Amino acid sequence: MTLLQVMAADDAARVRLRTTEEAAIAAELAAHGITFDRWPVLDDAAALSSDDLLAHYADRIAALNADGRYRHIDVARIHPDDADPQWPQTARAARTKFLDEHRHAEDEVRFFAAGRGCFYLHLGAEVLAVVCEGGDLMSVPAGTLHWFDMGERPDFIAVRFFEEADGWVGDFTGDRISAGFPTLDDLLTAP
């Protein structure tokens, strides 16, 4: 379920809004210049190769990239692999990479073809936690302070759009604000 929870930046327990209503989520994000959209999902996305997945969404990708600014479009995947004894360590390392507050020099555009992840947007006096699921497209404007949590058992497929090959590299602020907010797993289990 797509979820938006808006919290005070200085007190995560002060929740102004918690909703799963798509129109309310889109409106709240649009008020901050953040694009949110829904694309149809494929039931068998996990079975498709990255090339086949990109081919399936080619028309939507072309429309989103009509101005040609995204020169690098790829697919990121992470799935639980209990048969691999190294998987928990790999998952922890992947999750930890973007759990601290950072910004990017370009827009961070992601389409979740399957699974879920949570963007936390630090916008002035508030933090907006946006749990994205399969079908969600979100564009976080360049320079926006944020962090990302893929959960304790990361499982998602995301199409990523970059202007530059290193567009995913974060500029970390050193602020530990993220430690004071509910994790993706906490948000999903909250009443």
UniProtKB/Swiss-Prot annotation:
GO MF: acireductone dioxygenase (Ni2+-requiring) activity; acireductone dioxygenase [iron(II)-requiring] activity; iron ion binding; nickel cation binding
Quaternary data: Monomer.
Necessary cofactors: Fe(2+); Ni(2+)
Keywords: Amino-acid biosynthesis, Dioxygenase, Iron, Metal-binding, Methionine biosynthesis, Nickel, Oxidoreductase
Site keyed May play a role in transmitting local conformational changes: positions: 107
Annotated site location: Important to generate the dianion: 110
GO biological process: L-methionine salvage from methylthioadenosine; L-methionine salvage from S-adenosylmethionine
Protein name, as recorded: Acireductone dioxygenase 2
Organism, as annotated: Nocardia farcinica (strain IFM 10152)
Protein purpose: Catalyzes 2 different reactions between oxygen and the acireductone 1,2-dihydroxy-3-keto-5-methylthiopentene (DHK-MTPene) depending upon the metal bound in the active site. Fe-containing acireductone dioxygenase (Fe-ARD) produces formate and 2-keto-4-methylthiobutyrate (KMTB), the alpha-ketoacid precursor of methionine in the methionine recycle pathway. Ni-containing acireductone dioxygenase (Ni-ARD) produces methylthiopropionate, carbon monoxide and formate, and does not lie on the methionine recycle pathway.
Family annotation (Gene3D superfamilies): Jelly Rolls
Entries under HAMAP family matching the protein: Salvage_MtnD
